[in-house]
Amino acid sequence: GKKFNVIKNGIDYSKYRYQLKNRTECRKSISVADGYLVGCIGRLDPQKNPLMSVEIMKEISKLNATAKFVFVGDGELRPQVEQKIKEYNLEDRIVLLGARDDANKWYSAIDCLIMPSLFEGLPFTLVEAQAAGLSCVVSNTVSGDANITGLIEYVDLNQSTKVWADHILEACEKERLDTKEQLKKAGYSIQDTAEQVDKIIQTSLEKRVQC
C-alpha cells in the first residue's frame, strides 16, 4: 500500500487560552458575575444528549443555589431542550445562546465543560477546552485519547444525574492549568501542523522533479 501521513488538527492556542477579559465580558452578557457557570459547547442533537444536560443541571440547582448553565450551539433538539427547561422551572438558571462566532471565548467564561454524549470519537471541542485549561466532565463513550492534559474526567452514562452533578461541582473548583506545552507535545500546535504540511508538500514536489 501507499505510504500516508497522519496530521492532527492544529489549534491556535492564543485564540483559546484562558483570558480574564473574555470571562468577564461573556459572563456580563448573560448577567452572571460570580458563582459556577457550567457549559455545553456543541450541537443540540441526539448524539450530544442535551436533554441529559438539562437533567444534570436540575440536580446541580438542588446542590448549589447560584450555579448556572449555558448551551453554546444550536440544533434539532432545541425545542425539546426549551420545553424541558420550562418544565423544570430552570429558565433563570439555563441560558441558550444558539450558534456563536465567539464560541472560543466561552471556554474562559465557564468553570466546567460537560459532554454526556451517547457516542463520540475524539471531539475537537475537548482539545479547545483543554487549551483554555478548562476542567471537563464527559461520558465514558468519549475516546480516552481526548485526555491530553489530565483535565478530563470520565463518568459512566449509566450513572445517576446526582453522580454527574457531584463530579461537575468538584471540577468547577479546580484551578486552571497552562496546557500550551502539553498540547504542543501531543501534536496540536497549529504552527507545527503548518510546518508538517509544508514539509510534505516540499518532499512531494521534490519527488516529482526527480521523476
Per-region residue spans from a language model:
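A short helix/loop element that forms part of the nucleotide-sugar donor recognition site in Leloir-type
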Residues: R17-V32
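Aromatic "clamp/platform" in nucleotide-sugar-dependent glycosyltransferases that forms part
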Residues: A99, L118
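A charged, aromatic-enriched C-terminal amphipathic alpha-helix characteristic of glycosyltransferases
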Residues: E175-C211
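Short hydrophobic beta-strand element within catalytic cores of glycosyltransferases
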Residues: S135-S139
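Nucleotide-activated donor-binding/catalytic signature segment of Leloir-type glycosyltransferases, i.e.
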Residues: E82-G98
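Carbohydrate-associated surface elements
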Residues: G10
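A conserved mid-protein helix/loop that constitutes part of the nucleotide-sugar donor-binding site
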Residues: Y36, C40-E59, E76-E82
